[in-house]
Amino acid sequence: MTIWVDADACPKMIKDILFRAAIRTNTNLILVANSYLTYPNSPFIRSVLVEKGYDRADHYITSHMKAKDLVITADIPLAAEVIVKQGLAMSPRGELFTANNIKQRLTLRDINEQLRSAGERTGGPSALSAREKTNFANALDRWLAKSK
């Protein structure tokens, strides 16, 4: 079992939670990014540097992940592909993406994309709140407990 992180856009506070959890539970954690990252020296944590380019990190993750692995991402199309491959996808806000909710999330994403293309301002995600940070940590702990 491995935790994969779409690391370029993952907030630092979420990566810090992941680092502590990986070390505490001896769980493999792989950060995939197109820029260099700093992370604790641990046999359970490593990073993969992919070429800069559209969806390079996503393709790497989906090519190397296995069923039941956890992928941390805010990227809805990546989450959908993870679910197809029998993995679990979780947002940095602690939201689990499932077969039951991913189609709705993809549709909403596509609508927002069309609005942006038409010149509408849809705004980006709000800053991560303390409650969302706690939600993420709790969801991660539940997954780790089930997976061991």
Swiss-Prot record:
Pfam families: DUF188
InterPro entries for the chain: UPF0178
Family statement drawn from the similarity comment of this UniProt entry: Belongs to the UPF0178 family.
Organism per entry: Legionella pneumophila (strain Paris)
Protein name as it appears in the record: UPF0178 protein lpp0103
HAMAP family, per the entry: UPF0178
